[in-house]
Amino acid sequence: MENGSMKNSISFPRLTEMTLIGLTNVKSFYPEKHTLECPSLNVLKVYRCEALKMFSFSPLCCKQPAQVDEIHDMPFQIPLFSIEKVSPNLKDLALCSKDALKILNGGCLENNFQKVEVLRLHHFDETPVTFLNGFHAMFPNVVTLQVRGSSFEILFLSGGIDHINSQSPKKIQNLWLFELEQLRFIWQENFAGDHFVVQDLEGLTVLNCPNLITLVPSSLSLKYLTDLEVNNCKGLIYLITTKTAKSLVQLKRLVIANCEMMLDVVKIDEEKEEEEVIFENLEFMEFFSLSSLGSFCNGKQTFIFPSLLHFVVQGCPQLKIFSSGVTITPFLTGITLRVENRRIRWKDDLNTTIEQLFIEKEVSRSIEK
């Protein structure tokens, strides 16, 4: 504990990471009225600590007066940090809606979070969705954005401040969306393709979003996306359209799991059926527990996978054919059916193998009856 003007702070000069999870009854770090000073702190993550206040803000920045415990003459919630003293070296930060909105509305200096590269937003239950279009002004160097446990129906709206912020120095490279039970759309239709959250996007992970209707609007091009994983999104009927598929020239890894309503991975849009769709760099593809999946695509397009080496299929009982059109996979030599014991099947080509596996399952079902 420090003396003099800093007597109300406790210093941990070498602490680089602080993670607090599920401490529902903890109200303060120290029983007295003291905040922390951690000048070397790089990672600050606080989740599900409802009684704990993370930051104290300047009275000039707070529109509502703080609640006071009249018996002890002190705030009910003793903050961990003074916003003015938070480490300027933070690179990984988790924020709830209350703190995030105060920061966005001028609750701190603009240079407080200049070095933050990973921003984790959680429990935005009553927050206007427009926040997600403006956060980059306070966090200009964020390259990884995580949103979880919130009530958004649409994450990113089109137009307005979105386009202005597309000129920010850093663009989002990774977008992680977890446990967004009310989410219906990630991007609004006609969303600007040069927006900072789309332009350089390399990784997209969407987990436990059961009401998601559309993953990507067909108007968006994801030309830098290399990794796409979608798990437990039960409302998706298809993953992407053929127009979006054509933009995925850098995609290397595709994993789809536990999407029980999905009928096709690629849906035919207005593109001409005879046109080719080339996944130039796709090396790994996995379909797991897709109980309604009938095909990769039910159209006549030619699908070319010049780099595909591994294809894992498990728990897809309705998969009858890979594609109704031509499928070219020059380096694929087998379909992995069970990863744990490396069960691999292959007959002539990808379509023939899928057809043969479906026939065998049908024969097996008839014998069991």
Short names for language-model regions:
Residues 1-369:
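Cross-kingdom leucine-rich repeat
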